[in-house]
Amino acid sequence: MVDIDFMEIQLKLYGSSKLLSDKETLLIELPENSNIEQLRNSLSKIISDKYSKSNLGNLPKSAAFFSENNEVINDNYQLKNKELISIIPPIGGG
């Protein structure tokens, strides 16, 4: 049997993503050495499991993610345990 080590990521919520928690951040547990793509997948599962009746379904695919240094990060960005990552949903308007 293989033991999988996990890490915790703090996801700082902005805009419509604030509907996911009554706090400023959401704690997400991921396997060690996960990247942003895996964070998106985990967030999609959380939304489908807990918020299936909301309109947040496209949030993980369409949102931008930012590092602690406020740099836009892509899906290959390697996450670190206890890292603070910000999620910025798309903003519409006209």
Annotate the PLM regions:
Residues 2-93:
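Ubiquitin-like/PB1-type beta-grasp interaction modules and other compact soluble beta-rich domains
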